[in-house]
């Protein structure tokens, strides 16, 4: 799969290697952008645009990886659970706030990362396409 289709298209399947390459590219991109924009304290288009590009790219990579595991893109909504746990932690105190705000989001994100990045692909063609592909730089 050509790199820009792998990073920005919601169609097709992406294998584990492609998932980790895309995840790593987004991480490096955000790391570079964070160091460039670190002095800016006001949210402007220049500071928000890299975040939106990376968010869109990560969403496309995750959805294609879900397709490779023979799952629907609707399952990406499970990412709302850690966010809701974090928000709910502000309404509690003590150990419950720590459990909801730190432990649950980390646990859920770890399980999701294992699901998407470590488990094998669906071996046969499915409704989302042929066997999952990785990145090509052409």
Predicted regions and their residues:
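Membrane-helix interface segments in multi-pass membrane proteins
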Residues: 29-57, 79-112
């Amino acid at each position: 799969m050509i790199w820009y289709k792998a990073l920005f298209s919601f169609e097709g399947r992406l294998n584990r290697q492609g998932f980790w390459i895309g995840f790593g590219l987004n991480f490096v991109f955000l790391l570079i952008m964070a160091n460039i924009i670190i002095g800016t304290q006001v949210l402007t288009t220049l500071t928000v645009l890299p975040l939106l590009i990376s968010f869109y790219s990560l969403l496309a990579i995750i959805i294609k990886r879900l397709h490779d595991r023979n799952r629907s893109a609707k399952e990406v909504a499970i990412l709302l659970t850690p966010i809701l746990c974090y928000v709910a932690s502000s309404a509690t105190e003590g150990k419950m706030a720590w459990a909801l705000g730190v432990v649950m989001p980390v646990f859920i994100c770890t399980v999701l990362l294992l699901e998407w990045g470590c488990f094998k692909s669906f071996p046969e063609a499915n409704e989302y396409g042929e066997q999952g592909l990785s990145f090509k730089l052409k």
